[in-house]
Amino acid sequence: MAFDLAARLAERRAADLYRQRPLLQSPQGPNVVVDGQPLLAFCSNDYLGLANHPEVIAAWQAGAERWGVGGGASHLVVGHSTPHHQVEEALAELTGRPRALLFSTGYMANLGAITALVGQGDTVLQDRLNHASLLDGGLLSGARFNRYLHNDAVSLANRLGKACGNTLVVTDGVFSMDGDLADLPALAEVARARGAWLMVDDAHGLGTLGAHGGGIVEHFGLGIDDVPVLIGTLGKACGTAGAFVAGSDDLIEALVQFARPYIYTTSQPPALACATLKSLELLRRETWRREHLAGLIRQFREGAVQIGLQLMDSPTPIQPILIGDSAQALRLSQMLRERGLLVTAIRPPTVPAGSARLRVTLSAAHSEAQVQLLLNALADCYPQLEAADA
C-alpha cells in the first residue's frame, strides 16, 4: 500500500508524540467538564474570561435574531454585513490604525497577509519560533524565505543585508509556546533602516497588553510606521472567534484585492460579529480584568520559583513549565489531572526537540485561590517526577 498511515501513526505513538482531542462537555471557563471529568482548567486562551460572558452571549443571541445565523456569501459578493463593518471600525480604533479587515481565522489572516504582500523575487524573514501559520505563509508565498535567531535583531540585520525585492519581516508579538515578548522596538528599528516592513502577529497580546488592551504595539508605544502590518485574533482574549489585519488604507485595499484566504471564503456569521463588538467593549471598559490577570501572573511565578519549577521569561498569561522529555511532560500532566487539574503537555513538533513542557495559561476568570490550588498540586507532583527520573 502506497500510503502506510498505520506505520506513521505507530511511530508517532511510540515517540510519545501522539495527539488526541479531549472532549469539552461544558462552556469555557476555569471549571470545565472534559471527557466526563470535572476539572479546573489552566490551558485555555480565554485570557480575559469573556468566552462565556453573559453580555457577549446576549449580544450573539440578539444578533442572530436581527441578522440570522449565516454569512451567506463571501465579503466581496453579499456577505459583508453591517456588524462585520462595525467590528472592523472598532478594531481599527482599538489598534490606532486607519482600517482593519476581518478574517475567519488567525491562520487565514496570516496566510492572506503574507501571500498578498510578497511573492517571487521578494524576501520573507521570520523569527525561528514563529507560529506555524506564519511559517506556512512564508513558504507558500513563493518569496525567498529565511529565519533569523529568536528575538535577535542582530541576526535579523545580517539577513536583511542579503534580502532582495520587497522584504517582509514577520514575528509573533507574544510567542505562544514560550510566552516571551518580541523585542519590537529593536526589530522595528532594524527593519526601517533597511526599508523592510515589519508584520506582527499579536494573537496573544491583544487584550492583555497595553493600557487599553491594544496589544504589544501599544505596550511598547510604537505606531504604524514601526509596525505597518498588525495581525490580531478574536478567539483568545476577545473570547469569540476570527481574526483581523490592521493597517493603512492602502494595505487593507491591497488585501481585499489580493488576499486569497479573504476573497475565497464565506464571511463569518453576522451574529458572531455582534458578539465580538460586545467583547471589545468589555475589553476596553473593564480594565480590572487586565489588572487581576497581572496579579495572578505574579502570584504564579513567585510560587513556581519557590517550588523550583523551571519557568520561561514570560510576563504574559502563558507560563510554560519546562520539562524536556515528552514522556515526563505527559506524566506530570496526568498526575495533575488525577488531582482535578487540566494542564496540557506540549511536545515536539510544536516545540523544539528536548523542550517538552506544561503550558499553563491563566485567565482573569481564575481566582487567587484557584491559582494556589495549582501551585499546591505542582509542589506535590513535581518532586515525584524528579524522584522517578533520578
From Swiss-Prot:
Keywords: Biotin biosynthesis, Pyridoxal phosphate, Transferase. The keyword Transferase applies. Substrate binds at R19, H131, T350. It catalyses: 6-carboxyhexanoyl-[ACP] + L-alanine + H(+) = (8S)-8-amino-7-oxononanoate + holo-[ACP] + CO2. It is an enzyme of class 2 (transferase). Pfam families: Aminotran_1_2. GO terms for molecular function: 8-amino-7-oxononanoate synthase activity; pyridoxal phosphate binding. The modification N6-(pyridoxal phosphate)lysine is found at K236. Its cofactor is pyridoxal 5'-phosphate. Pyridoxal 5'-phosphate binds at G106, Y107, S176, H204, T233. Pathway: Cofactor biosynthesis; biotin biosynthesis. GO terms for biological process: biotin biosynthetic process. InterPro entries: Aminotransferase_I/II_large, AON_synthase_class-II, AONS_Archaea/Proteobacteria, AONS_Proteobacteria, PyrdxlP-dep_Trfase, PyrdxlP-dep_Trfase_major, PyrdxlP-dep_Trfase_small. Its EC number is 2.3.1.47. It comes from the Bacteria. Belongs to the class-II pyridoxal-phosphate-dependent aminotransferase family. BioF subfamily. Catalyzes the decarboxylative condensation of pimeloyl-[acyl-carrier protein] and L-alanine to produce 8-amino-7-oxononanoate (AON), [acyl-carrier protein], and carbon dioxide. Homodimer. HAMAP family: BioF_aminotrans_2. This is 8-amino-7-oxononanoate synthase. It comes from Pseudomonas putida (strain W619). The gene is bioF.
